[in-house]
Regions:
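Alpha-helical transmembrane segments and their immediate juxtamembrane cytosolic regions
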Residues: 1-292
Length: 292
């Protein structure tokens, strides 16, 4: 996903000068229209080259690696449209984050608005998604599309599964609430829940006290270090034959992340990877200014 983040950050550059209202409108439109555009592009591509041919050669099916630079067209298609996190639809979350970051988050009225708006969006999308899942024929239609048992499919629709990418040519995909499916309903569910949690945390901050929140504040300052660090831990765990999905491992990662966040907060320093990125960004900016 780091490749996707890199592309998202580049696309965000023209938006940095916009105000919260404009960014919010863009994010809202992107949440709805992004998945529709992905649906249209992928459906058209499958119609042009054939369904099976598209599945075999239309995406990487793995996280991008250095060798994929030798296939720039396929790499770009995977990052923007056909991969697990297509920027064409997932970019909405970055723009939403930019919009929220422009708001005066220390005001309780703003925090309450974020909580209320997020909860409303989440509830509305949840009602729509639940109605679609309960509608007669939905599970059978999905099972026929991806070639799975209806009982397994019913569970898959509630938990998420990469094979749902095979559903994209069917417009029903746009209304599925399945996590990480990239549908319109799933996008609004995720965005609404994220806003609701953020608003609730902002409202709870004065009640909890700054000292108790320092591990969380620090963790928020070193997201890249924590993300890459947890990938390294998961790779080491997987190499030992242990189960990466073990609940004890999740608890350990949470504790380690909070400990690292507290250390970053107390030291007042960036994380190691954040420091590297800051130096690279500063060097690139100075070179760009110097070359004018």
């Amino acid at each position: 996903i780091l490749c996707h983040y890199a592309l998202l950050f580049l696309l965000a550059l023209p938006l940095l000068g916009l105000r919260a209202r404009a960014l919010g409108l863009i994010a809202g439109a992107w949440l709805v229209l992004g998945p529709v555009l992905v649906f249209a592009v992928v459906a058209a591509a499958q119609a042009a080259v054939g369904r099976q041919e598209f599945f075999v050669g239309g995406r990487l099916w793995l996280s991008p690696g250095p060798a994929d630079l030798l296939r720039p067209g396929l790499l770009l298609a995977d990052l923007t449209v056909t991969g697990y996190y297509p920027v064409l639809s997932w970019g909405a979350f970055l723009v939403l984050g930019l919009a929220l970051g422009r708001l005066p988050l220390d005001r309780r009225r703003v925090a309450a608005g974020i909580l209320g708006g997020g909860a409303t969006a989440w509830a509305a999308a949840g009602v729509v998604g639940a109605a679609v899942l309960r509608a007669p024929g939905t599970v059978g239609r999905v099972a026929a599309a991806i070639g799975t048992d209806p009982v397994e499919t019913a569970l898959t629709l509630r938990t998420g599964e990469p094979r749902l990418a095979l559903l994209i040519p069917d417009p029903l995909w746009l209304a599925l609430p399945t996590p990480h499916s990239g549908s319109v309903v799933a996008a609004v569910l995720a965005a609404g829940w994220a806003c609701a949690v953020l608003g609730a945390c902002l409202l709870a901050r004065p009640l909890v006290g700054h000292a108790a929140l320092r591990p969380l504040v620090g963790a928020g300052r070193i997201p890249l270090t924590l993300y890459v660090g947890h990938l390294v831990v998961l790779a080491l765990v997987d190499a030992t034959g242990l189960d990466p999905a073990d609940g004890a491992l999740l608890a350990a990662l949470v504790v380690l992340s909070l400990a690292a966040g507290l250390a970053a907060e107390l030291s007042g320093r960036r994380g190691p990877l954040e420091a590297v990125m800051a130096r690279l960004s500063r060097a690139g900016g100075e070179r760009a200014v110097g070359g004018r």
